[in-house]
Each structure stands twice: as C-alpha cells, then as structure tokens.
C-alpha cells in the first residue's frame, strides 16, 4: 500500500480538532461548500474514487472573509493540476459561490510553494496538517501560524531539483513529529503509516515494478 486511506485521514483530522468543521474525504466530485455561513474544510482527491485515488488536496472555507483556500503540498498551478491530474475545481467553486454569498462572489487563495518531496506519498498527511492550521487560524492558514511555520516551502519549479531534497525531507520529518504530538491515531499506527507514506515511496514502487 502507498499513501493514506480515507479512514486514516478522517481519524487524524478528528484528532487534530477539525471534526466539527470537517466535511469528510471526497474524490474529484466534491460538491463544494454548500452551507456558506459555516467554517468548513475537506480533503479532496484529484481522481475518482473508483481509481483508488492519485493525489490529495485540502480545501477550507472561511465564511467571514468569503475565502476558499486550496492547499496542494506540491504547490502546482491551476494549469499544472489540470495537465497532470486532469483535475478541475471551477465547478466546485461556482457551486460554493452560489451557496455561500449574497453577491455570488468569493476569493480563492491557493498554495504556490512545494513542501512535499517529489517521490513522497505523504500528500494526505500534509493536508491534515494544513487543516489543523486552517481551523485554528482561519484567516492565515497558509503561513504565519505556528503549524505551517514548521514547514519550509520551495518554489514549485524546483520540485525535481536535488538541492531542495534535504529541505523537503526535513518537512516530512517535521510532519511526522507534528502528528506524533497531536494525533493518538497516528501514534498507534505510526510504523505502518510512515512506511506507506515514505519520502521515497514512489521511487520504491517504480523499482519494484
């Protein structure tokens, strides 16, 4: 197994205090934030559930600022998300805007830096970490808060550069330490989770094929 299961992510998110706001894990058909007056968040896969999943993203809705946050651990642009994963979220944003604001307008803020290594399978866990930041600091979840300050972002264009690998490896180590402090579920299943989400997991899978 590689990556994180929906059950694991839901358990960790609950441990991190996101339960009252968490709409669950979804595939690419996530309908959006339809109760527009409530703080809400979700973890969304870029693929259909029938495929087994490809890559996890996190979304948060702050009704006070009418802002939708999209966190991608790789920090890909809209164009690259569509190119690599065939993932489009415009329809979700339109549904959210219709439901959430009188003037049908909202702001989108998305991550632009890479915090995850190119062969890491920890995207779901990074999404859990972001949602902890979102529910505790909903006006500044991307950075400038104690949770996300544990990670160091690098420009997305350097994702495949050997010179940033030590930084991205440290990020994954910080991620595991953070979850070990805050999630009893992670502590109970740490060895299995770290094996399935290892920093070089995708490389391991390529070699074994």
From Swiss-Prot:
SUPFAM superfamilies, per the entry: Cysteine proteinases (SSF54001)
Family, as annotated: Belongs to the peptidase C5 family.
Assembly and oligomerization: Interacts with protease cofactor pVI-C; this interaction is necessary for protease activation.
Enzyme class: hydrolase
Catalytic function, reaction form: Cleaves proteins of the adenovirus and its host cell at two consensus sites: -Yaa-Xaa-Gly-Gly-|-Xaa- and -Yaa-Xaa-Gly-Xaa-|-Gly- (in which Yaa is Met, Ile or Leu, and Xaa is any amino acid)
Any one cellular-component term (Gene Ontology): host cell nucleus
Catalytic machinery residues: 55, 72, 123
Species, as recorded: Human adenovirus D serotype 9
Record Pfam families: Peptidase_C5
Locations listed in the record: Virion; Host nucleus
Top-level taxon in the UniProt lineage: Viruses
UniProt-listed Enzyme Commission number(s): 3.4.22.39
InterPro entries according to UniProt: Papain-like_cys_pep_sf, Peptidase_C5
Further comment found in the protein's record: All late proteins expressed from the major late promoter are produced by alternative splicing and alternative polyadenylation of the same gene giving rise to non-overlapping ORFs. A leader sequence is present in the N-terminus of all these mRNAs and is recognized by the viral shutoff protein to provide expression although conventional translation via ribosome scanning from the cap has been shut off in the host cell.
Regulation: Requires DNA and protease cofactor for maximal activation. Inside nascent virions, becomes partially activated by binding to the viral DNA, allowing it to cleave the cofactor that binds to the protease and fully activates it. Actin, like the viral protease cofactor, seems to act as a cofactor in the cleavage of cytokeratin 18 and of actin itself.
Residues annotated as site: Cleavage: 52-53
Function per UniProt: Cleaves viral precursor proteins (pTP, pIIIa, pVI, pVII, pVIII, and pX) inside newly assembled particles giving rise to mature virions. Protease complexed to its cofactor slides along the viral DNA to specifically locate and cleave the viral precursors. Mature virions have a weakened organization compared to the unmature virions, thereby facilitating subsequent uncoating. Without maturation, the particle lacks infectivity and is unable to uncoat. Late in adenovirus infection, in the cytoplasm, may participate in the cytoskeleton destruction. Cleaves host cell cytoskeletal keratins K7 and K18.
Lineage: Viruses, Varidnaviria, Bamfordvirae, Preplasmiviricota, Tectiliviricetes
Induction behaviour: Expressed in the late phase of the viral replicative cycle.
Record's protein name: Protease
Keywords: Autocatalytic cleavage, Disulfide bond, DNA-binding, Host nucleus, Hydrolase, Late protein, Protease, Thiol protease, Virion
GO molecular function (one): cysteine-type endopeptidase activity
């Amino acid at each position: 197994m590689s990556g994180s299961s929906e059950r694991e992510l839901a358990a960790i998110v609950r441990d991190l205090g996101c339960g009252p706001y968490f709409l669950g894990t979804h595939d690419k058909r996530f309908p959006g934030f339809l109760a527009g007056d409530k703080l809400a968040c979700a973890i969304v896969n870029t693929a259909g559930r029938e495929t087994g999943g490809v890559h996890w993203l996190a979304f948060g809705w702050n009704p006070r600022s009418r802002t939708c946050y999209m966190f991608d651990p790789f920090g890909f642009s809209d164009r690259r998300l569509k190119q690599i994963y065939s993932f489009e979220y415009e329809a979700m944003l339109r549904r959210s805007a219709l439901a959430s604001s009188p003037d049908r307008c909202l702001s989108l803020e998305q991550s632009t830096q890479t915090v995850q290594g190119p062969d890491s399978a920890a995207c779901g866990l990074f999404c859990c970490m972001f949602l902890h930041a979102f529910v505790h600091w909903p006006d500044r979840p991307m950075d400038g808060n104690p949770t996300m300050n544990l990670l160091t972002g690098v420009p997305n264009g350097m994702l495949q550069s050997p010179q940033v690998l030590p930084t991205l490896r440290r990020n994954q180590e910080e991620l595991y330490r953070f979850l070990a402090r805050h999630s009893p579920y992670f502590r109970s299943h740490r060895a299995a989770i770290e094996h399935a989400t290892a920093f070089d997991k995708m490389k391991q899978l390529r070699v074994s094929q």
